[in-house]
């Protein structure tokens, strides 16, 4: 891999650091971060979710905590609002809530595009790439080669870059790629690296996407890799789909650190639970060489027989941060779906991340399952915002709009619903004054299902594949359903029964659809602890372009 694009990024970074607030600095910043004034579709620009100021983004990459900051790199097109010219964008946060956009970290060039990968802090300097007193950040990413690269066009291999200034600038390793297949492959990608403490080595998961194989490797120095094993399914039920972005994560079962299970996250496209792309997972054991799942759905099973991190349509390319200070892994995903991502009606940007989420493993119905909740930092921040407490409401065969004080387009709603004798009960968010527009969260007592229904949520005809309803089985707990709902200008995220179920959907409502209502159908339901917290007043958490 040639380093011309990296050196260009270095020159831009040095210019940004050196320049004062003048024309040269403004132009350099705009070229790398896109800080032109907002235009296009600001009514759908996220306030709570990271999105670049302009242009296309997809997979989160290089998720790492270093020197007091969370780093979010991501697949980025620096020159357009469609997929292409794959490079690594870059943003940072100190709290997982407020994000700052930085110049492009690694840029596509004439012979190579920079596909997905991961970053670790090489605190022991096992790679030998650090400088005195400064351990390096090491990125492993997929090089996709073009004509003139010395590889067949389209070949994918794993390459390395490193930083000795906490991620501000990146230097390509002189002998890239560091890992290839023999024969070379056009589907070998997405390295995720972590430290495997029991074996004192680095562990990498990658995929051969079209073969539905996760390949595991080990290394002592992040440069030289040896094969460990393959993980696949004996009867892959989704022929034609791709496996992408694997991540192997250890978690204590029910909080017992003496009982560690391993979770293999595999993002699949298409064939997800909600249609199109999604993130499934397997729980099992890892012995230092081989991952063995506890259960695999029988041959011929449909998606409902598999486990999913999220049952909505817009949760893909999920991965976890490396080196986080807390005890629970923190994951984040791309908030879109390959079924319609290229047609999402936003401009001058297209693509956003989900809320960061904490992962835990709990025994549910006799099996270990992931529990997914908003990151504690988000909830702590939201807890400090002004809230309206509606108290307890009883609704019988009716829809009741909440008080005017609950109106807003960026908010967190918490409530416990007791459906009682109602056939269906729930909430409507981003509801219009005439009631014709709104996103419905519906519990069906007979079917024991929770539905996120965006069929009347606003603009929905931009793509025929923009699915309307997303349904998940969910029994009540002691006759109740606990919900945490996070509403942004262009999305709704639902966390039910303490994270047992999550649903994430994009929505595109008119700006004046700012009301909240509760409803019960064919009977009585009660809504207790109903609290609406406004999260927009006082400034956005969304990205601002910044010099390093």
List the predicted regions and their residue ranges.
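N-terminal secretory signal peptides that target proteins for export/translocation
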Residues: 1-10
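Short beta-strand/loop turn elements enriched in aromatics
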Residues: 5, 14, 32-33, 447-456
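Bacterial N-terminal signal peptides
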Residues: 13-24
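N-terminal signal peptide c-region/cleavage motif recognized by signal peptidases
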Residues: 25-29
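Beta-rich carbohydrate-recognition and catalytic domains
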Residues: 31-190, 195-243, 252-310, 326, ...
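Catalytic nucleophile-His microenvironment captured as a short glycine-rich beta-strand/loop
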Residues: 249
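Beta-rich accessory regions
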Residues: 255-257, 285-305, 309-548
């Amino acid at each position: 891999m040639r380093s011309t694009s990296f050196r260009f990024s270095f020159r831009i970074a040095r210019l940004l650091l050196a320049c004062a607030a003048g024309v040269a600095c403004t132009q350099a910043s705009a070229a790398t971060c896109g800080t032109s004034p907002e235009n296009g579709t600001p009514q759908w620009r996220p306030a709570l979710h990271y999105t670049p100021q302009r242009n296309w983004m997809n997979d989160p990459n290089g998720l790492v905590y270093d020197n007091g900051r969370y780093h979010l790199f991501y697949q980025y097109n620096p020159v357009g609002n469609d997929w292409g010219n794959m490079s690594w964008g870059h943003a940072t946060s100190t709290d997982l809530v407020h994000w700052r956009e930085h110049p492009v970290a690694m840029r596509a060039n004439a012979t190579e595009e920079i596909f997905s990968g991961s970053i670790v802090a090489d605190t022991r300097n096992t790679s030998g790439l650090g400088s005195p007193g400064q351990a390096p950040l090491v990125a492993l990413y997929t090089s996709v080669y073009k004509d003139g690269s010395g590889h067949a066009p389209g070949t994918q291999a794993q390459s390395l870059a490193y930083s000795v200034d906490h991620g501000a600038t990146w230097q390509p390793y002189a002998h890239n790629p560091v890992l290839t297949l023999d024969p070379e492959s056009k589907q070998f990608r997405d390295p995720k690296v972590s430290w495997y403490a029991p074996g004192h080595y680095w562990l990498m998961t990658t995929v051969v996407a079209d073969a539905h194989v996760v390949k595991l490797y080990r290394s002592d120095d992040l440069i030289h890799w040896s094969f460990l094993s393959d993980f696949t399914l004996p009867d892959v039920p989704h022929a034609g789909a791709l496996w992408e972005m694997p991540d192997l994560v250890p978690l204590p079962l029910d909080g017992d650190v003496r009982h560690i299970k391993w979770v293999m996250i595999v993002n699949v496209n298409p064939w997800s639970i909600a249609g199109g792309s999604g993130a499934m997972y397997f729980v099992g054991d890892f012995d230092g060489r081989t991952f063995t799942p506890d259960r695999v759905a029988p041959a011929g099973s449909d998606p409902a027989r598999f486990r999913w991190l999220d049952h909505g349509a817009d949760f893909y390319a999920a991965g976890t941060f490396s080196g986080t200070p807390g005890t629970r892994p923190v994951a984040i995903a791309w908030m879109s779906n390959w079924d319609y991502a290229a047609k999402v009606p936003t401009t001058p940007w297209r693509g956003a991340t989900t809320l960061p989420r904490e992962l835990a493993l709990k025994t549910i119905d006799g099996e270990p399952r992931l529990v997914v909740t908003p990151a504690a930092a988000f909830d702590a921040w939201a807890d400090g915002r002004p809230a309206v407490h509606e108290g307890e409401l009883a609704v019988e065969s009716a829809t009741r709009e909440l008080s005017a004080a609950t109106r807003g387009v960026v908010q967190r709603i918490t409530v416990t619903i007791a459906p009682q004798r109602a056939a269906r009960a729930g909430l409507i968010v981003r509801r219009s004054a005439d009631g014709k527009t709104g996103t419905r969260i519906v519990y069906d007592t007979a079917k024991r299902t929770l539905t996120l229904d965006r069929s009347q949520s606003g603009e929905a005809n931009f793509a025929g594949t923009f699915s309307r309803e997303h349904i998940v089985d969910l029994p009540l707990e002691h006759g109740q359903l606990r919900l945490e709902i996070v509403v942004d200008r262009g999305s709704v995220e639902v966390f039910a029964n303490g994270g047992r179920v999550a649903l994430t959907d994009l929505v595109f409502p008119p700006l004046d659809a700012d009301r909240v209502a509760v409803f019960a159908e064919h009977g009585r339901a009660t809504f207790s602890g109903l609290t609406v917290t406004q999260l927009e007043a006082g400034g956005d958490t969304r990205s601002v372009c910044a010099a390093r």
